[in-house]
Amino acid sequence: MVKFSKVLMLMVLAGTVSAAFAAEGDPMARAVFYGALAIGAGVAIGAAAGGGAAGLGNAIRGVLEGMARNPNMGPKLLTTMFIGMALIETFVLYALLIAIIFIFTGIFDSKAGF
């Protein structure tokens, strides 16, 4: 666990240093910065998709258990499950949208003021 936290701290430090160098206009540092931004966006989308998949699995499991206990509640449970699944999927789509905005708008560019 200590080794993991050290590696994580080193990665965060490397990301901040590349952002500082990118502000100076060095082309290699800008390439590293945007590469790190792309990797971070991919990790964010992967984490959102993994969390969404776990949430969908739990929702389906709960509905199937409810249907097994009381088959007459099946249609009501299915309706509620589909609404919940739509809300879980919007979480993943929001993560994708935010990642696309970060990558293509240059929001962290030094000219933007951030």
Curated annotation (Swiss-Prot):
Protein name: ATP synthase subunit c
Broad class of where this protein is predominantly found: membrane
Gene Ontology MF, one: lipid binding
Function: F(1)F(0) ATP synthase produces ATP from ADP in the presence of a proton or sodium gradient. F-type ATPases consist of two structural domains, F(1) containing the extramembraneous catalytic core and F(0) containing the membrane proton channel, linked together by a central stalk and a peripheral stalk. During catalysis, ATP synthesis in the catalytic domain of F(1) is coupled via a rotary mechanism of the central stalk subunits to proton translocation.
Membrane topology recorded in Swiss-Prot or TrEMBL: Multi-pass membrane protein
Subunit and partners: F-type ATPases have 2 components, F(1) - the catalytic core - and F(0) - the membrane proton channel. F(1) has five subunits: alpha(3), beta(3), gamma(1), delta(1), epsilon(1). F(0) has three main subunits: a(1), b(2) and c(10-14). The alpha and beta chains form an alternating ring which encloses part of the gamma chain. F(1) is attached to F(0) by a central stalk formed by the gamma and epsilon chains, while a peripheral stalk is formed by the delta and b chains.
GO annotations of cellular component type: plasma membrane; proton-transporting ATP synthase complex; proton-transporting two-sector ATPase complex, proton-transporting domain
